[in-house]
Regions:
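DNA breakage-rejoining catalytic core of tyrosine-based enzymes
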Residues: 1-19, 73-82, 98-101
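Short, basic, alpha-helical segments at the C-terminal edge of helix-turn-helix-like DNA-binding modules
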Residues: 146, 193-197
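Active-site-proximal segment of tyrosine recombinases
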Residues: 49-51, 148, 156-170
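Conserved tyrosine-mediated DNA breakage-rejoining catalytic core shared by Y-recombinases
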Residues: 52-84
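Short basic/aromatic active-site micro-motif
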Residues: 134-154
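Catalytic-site neighborhood detector that most strongly recognizes the C-terminal catalytic loop/helix
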Residues: 69-73, 169-194
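Active-site/catalytic core of tyrosine-dependent DNA strand-transfer enzymes
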Residues: 15-18, 83-134
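Basic, Lys/Arg- and aromatic-enriched nucleic-acid-binding interface segment
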Residues: 2, 15-43, 157-158
């Protein structure tokens, strides 16, 4: 959590660090947080939307689900990556879930109450320290940014990737998407590299 009237931006994790974190959390029997981090980096949804996910959505036979985004009220269809599907099923089995309509990220504090965003941010900061993650500002937003950065870096056509991400993130321009992913700052800093002495 940031101080009132201050501005702190979250950073993205390197993809290998993010997927390794998901595996380590699972290995350490922290199944729900492993699943939460995994869903964040594989779906690119805002945390408010991740917290709406039910087991029925994640275990869908056609490996996709539709969600109405809380912030924009827009419907978004999400396809579940084949490799990530196995992790979802493993978490489902390990947690011994009995009700498919149950939210995936129940806090245990009251019936049908999901984790709070503040609590998740505290947990992420603890994970940063515990697993020695190389990231300055680690928050729920970092998961979405990690997704975006991976999509951008994996694409052979950077401009097309930015247009796709702009639509997925519901940004009004590619410029906003570039700034969101920290690409604009990198471009500006790279300006200094073109100088010679």
């Amino acid at each position: 959590m940031s101080l009132k009237n201050s501005y702190t931006t979250s950073d993205c994790l390197q993809w290998d660090s993010a997927t390794n974190l998901v595996r380590k959390l699972y290995r350490d029997k922290n199944y729900r947080i492993s699943l939460l981090v995994g869903c964040g980096i594989f779906f690119g949804l805002r945390i408010s939307d991740l917290l709406q996910l039910t087991w029925e959505m994640l275990l869908s036979k056609d490996a996709k689900f539709t969600i109405t985004e809380k912030k924009t009220s827009k419907r978004r269809e999400v396809r579940i990556n084949k490799e990530f599907q196995k992790h979802i099923k493993d978490c489902y089995t390990a947690l011994d879930i009995q009700n498919l309509n149950e939210f995936c990220f129940l806090s245990g504090k009251g019936r049908n109450k999901v984790y709070s965003i503040q609590w998740i941010n505290i947990v992420l900061k603890e994970l940063k320290s515990k697993y020695n993650l190389k990231i300055d500002h680690f928050s729920t937003h970092s998961l979405r940014k990690t997704f975006g950065r991976k999509v951008f870096e994996s694409s052979e056509n950077a401009e097309l990737a930015l247009v796709k991400l702009m639509e997925l993130f519901n940004h009004s321009s590619v410029t906003i998407t570039k700034r969101y992913l920290g690409l604009r700052q990198e471009e500006l800093l790279n300006t200094y590299d073109c100088l010679s002495f």
